[in-house]
């Protein structure tokens, strides 16, 4: 082989290596293939020097492809993971710091509120001239005075909610020449006499139950009618005025007169200042008369039905008790204590009594008829014998 033929092959090989480096920089496969193709064509017509150049180029090409296919070094992945862990740690630290600051702020506000409450409610009461009113805590240390007065204030406030406002909720019975009815009827307002309804157009409204006027007119001569409701006075007072324009209701008692027990407003009959054997409580909740269960009559809750006749039947039931002169109403109401609808039970028993009375009358009439026929035959026989 001449030197002339070797020189072009070396030039071509160097050019191929240069192009290979440029192809590695742009990282595209087609230029590398273009380099291989002309070299392979040249090596087919040249000597062993061209084969050596082709082998070098193919080795470089394979190294470049392997470098592209290999994943990034583990050092880079660990670096990314460390960065992410650092960010998560920083975020957790910020969250913990924010929680700590919120708790500190809440503690400071709570402490300040407690100090303010003790200062406001633990101070001495003052009279109209602004002078302090002495109490049983004046001899204590100032801080102890504030704490004990605050405790007493909230204790009295709780007692005011739980206990009735007075041990005697009603005044003493009327004396002659005034008329005092022999029995006392205690009525609930909500869902017994009225039903609250709400609409978007009118807001809250109270529907009057059919038979209220009839109930008051029939029972006013026999019962001392008292409205005792778990509603507040501000809500109930105008409602009572609207349903009782003639003044049949003698007294009105509201939520503050109830005894708060286990989440219910209980009406304590013993605080009414009346003979408990003559008191009947009408409500739709049995818990309302839980302290004296045999003084109560639990009606079904009225849902606003305009065809309801319960108050008419209730008037008949209560009128029957009063006109019968029952000495202790608890002996009668005890029979209806476990009835889901005592008025329906009363109507069933009344119908049964009516059937029994009709049967008794018919039997008596039959006996009289038989006695009359036997007497007539005996009289005729006796008159004939004398003749």
From Swiss-Prot:
GO BP annotation list: apoptotic process; mitochondrial membrane organization; protein dephosphorylation; protein import into mitochondrial matrix
One Pfam short name: NIF
Chief site of localization: mitochondrion
Any Gene Ontology CC annotation: TIM23 mitochondrial import inner membrane translocase complex
Keyword Transit peptide: yes
Listed GO MF terms: protein serine/threonine phosphatase activity; protein tyrosine phosphatase activity
Cross-referenced Gene3D superfamilies: HAD superfamily/HAD-like
Bias (Basic and acidic residues) ranges: 77-93
Similarity comment text for this entry: Belongs to the TIM50 family.
Self-association and partners: Component of the TIM23 complex at least composed of timm23, timm17 and timm50.
Protein name from the UniProt record: Mitochondrial import inner membrane translocase subunit TIM50
Primary gene name: timm50
């Amino acid at each position: 082989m001449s030197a002339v033929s070797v020189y072009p092959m070396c030039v071509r090989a160097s050019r191929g290596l240069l192009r290979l480096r440029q192809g590695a920089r742009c990282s595209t496969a087609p230029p590398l293939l273009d380099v291989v193709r002309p070299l392979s064509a040249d090596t087919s017509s040249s000597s062993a020097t061209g084969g050596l150049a082709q082998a070098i180029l193919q080795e470089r090409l394979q190294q470049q492809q392997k470098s592209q296919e290999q994943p990034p070094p583990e050092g880079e992945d660990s670096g990314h993971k460390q960065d992410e862990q650092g960010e998560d740690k920083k975020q957790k630290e910020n969250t913990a710091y924010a929680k700590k600051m919120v708790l500190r702020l809440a503690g400071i506000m709570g402490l300040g509120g407690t100090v303010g409450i003790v200062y406001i409610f633990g101070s001495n009461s003052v009279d109209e001239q602004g002078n302090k009113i002495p109490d049983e805590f004046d001899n204590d240390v100032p801080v102890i005075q504030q704490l004990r007065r605050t405790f007493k204030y909230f204790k009295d406030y709780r007692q005011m909610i739980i206990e009735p406002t007075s041990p005697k909720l009603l005044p003493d019975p009327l004396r002659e020449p005034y008329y005092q009815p022999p029995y006392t009827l205690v009525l609930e307002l909500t869902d017994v006499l009225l039903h609250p309804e709400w609409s978007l157009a009118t807001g809250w409204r109270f529907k009057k139950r059919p038979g209220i006027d009839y109930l008051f007119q029939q029972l006013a001569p026999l019962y001392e009618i008292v409205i005792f409701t778990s509603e507040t006075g501000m809500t109930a007072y105008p409602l009572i005025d609207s349903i009782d324009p003639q003044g049949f209701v003698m007294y009105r008692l509201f939520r503050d007169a109830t005894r708060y027990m286990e989440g219910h407003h209980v009406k304590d009959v013993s605080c009414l200042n009346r003979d408990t054997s003559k008191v009947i409580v009408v409500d739709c909740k049995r818990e309302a008369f839980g302290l004296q269960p045999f003084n109560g009559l639990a009606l079904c809750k009225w849902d606003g039905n305009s065809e309801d006749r319960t108050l008419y039947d209730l008037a008949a039931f209560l009128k029957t008790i009063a006109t019968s002169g029952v000495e202790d109403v608890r002996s009668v109401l005890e029979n209806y204590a476990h009835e889901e609808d005592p008025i329906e039970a009363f109507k069933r028993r009344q119908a049964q009594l009516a059937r029994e009375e009709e049967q008794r009358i018919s039997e008596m009439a039959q006996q009289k008829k038989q006695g009359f026929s036997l007497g007539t035959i005996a009289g005729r026989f006796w008159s004939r014998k004398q003749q």
